[in-house]
Regions:
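Secondary-structure boundary elements
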Residues: 2-102
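Short, contiguous, pocket-lining structural segments
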Residues: 57, 103-107, 133
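A structural signal for well-ordered alpha-helical segments within the folded catalytic domains
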Residues: 63, 102-113
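Long, hydrophobic/aromatic-enriched structural stretches that serve as scaffold segments
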Residues: 68, 72-75, 106-111, 118
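Hydrophobic/aromatic-rich core segments of domains that either
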Residues: 109-143
Length: 143
């Protein structure tokens, strides 16, 4: 291992220690999923996600929705968050509108809420960098 590789690895480990200095005190709680939001009925009425998801396991159905949405939503890291962060508003703003890109947080929000509307357990997960010099993060949907 050369000096640059050693220094990079050192910085990653420094970041791990820095980001995990302390833990939130308190007791563990169960994750709760709300699949009964009134807006979900509007979402399924306006967009054909039930037909797109089709039949099969939750994962198979979620993958079909993902494959449908992916080419229809443009990614933009410069999206400023001016649209309400819910699937209905974000789809109205960005679906099939390449000039209206949204960031990963909002793309994950759309997939999460569509899945919940379909009765598929889903949640957003944020990935934070371990390097103390990297301020970028990423958000995905976990099924």
């Amino acid at each position: 291992m050369n000096f640059e590789e050693t220094e990079d690895l050192y910085n990653v480990y420094r970041g791990i220690l820095r980001n995990n200095r302390s833990f939130q005190p308190g007791k563990s709680t169960a994750v709760e999923y709300r699949m009964d939001c009134p807006e979900y009925a509007d979402l399924l009425k306006k967009y054909p996600f039930e037909k797109i998801a089709g039949k099969g396991t939750d994962l198979q159905r979620a993958i079909r929705v993902l494959k449908y949405l992916s080419p229809k939503l443009t990614h933009s890291p410069w999206y400023d968050g001016h649209v309400d962060c819910n699937a209905l508003a974000l789809l109205d703003y960005s679906l099939d509108k390449s000039e209206q890109g949204i960031n990963c947080l909002n793309k994950a929000k759309i997939l999460e809420e569509v899945c919940l509307a379909l009765g598929i357990y889903a949640r957003r997960v944020r990935f934070l960098p371990y390097s103390p010099f990297d301020f970028d993060c990423h958000v995905v949907t976990e099924i």
